[in-house]
């Protein structure tokens, strides 16, 4: 199993806050605002998603693509075209489901110590994600390994991309995945 920059919970709760949860989509008010924007101004909503999901936009570094560059423009055109094919109301419902679900117990019971699972798990987090601090996705490793080292799950925090690191650096991502699959 491979998780890519996805924390087991997006919303903030008393035991889960900004150190692990989603940077922006983490409470009912944020969800309501996104849903409204998806219905009334979908282009703006999708441009916000693109900005958060591409590391070179959310956490730019020297040498990264810049606004106006070919890569910036092509990525934006591609993702915006694809996103605008969908219905904003349905995207809003999907995000309501996506943000509210808390997978921590399900991961612990399905893959953790005592579950009997031997499923190998790779968690790819990003230090440049506009969606999650890397600690959120990496919590999956702790849950699957029961808080001990040497379990079936391992995690890595990459610096070469954001939430969509597989898009930004597909060769590096594929190398990471192929190495994991060959273990």
Region locations from a protein language model:
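C-terminal alpha-helix
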Residues: 176-183
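Short, flexible/disordered intra-domain loops and linkers
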Residues: 14-21, 64-66, 131-139
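Conserved loop-alpha-helix segment in the C-terminal half of the alpha/beta-hydrolase fold
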Residues: 110-162, 167, 172-174
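Low-complexity, intrinsically disordered short segments enriched for Gly/Pro and polybasic residues
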Residues: 7-10, 26-33, 78, 100, ...
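Flexible "cap/lid" loop of the alpha/beta hydrolase fold
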Residues: 1-42
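Alpha/beta-hydrolase
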Residues: 22, 37-129
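Active-site-proximal flexible loops/turns
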Residues: 12, 16, 94, 166-170
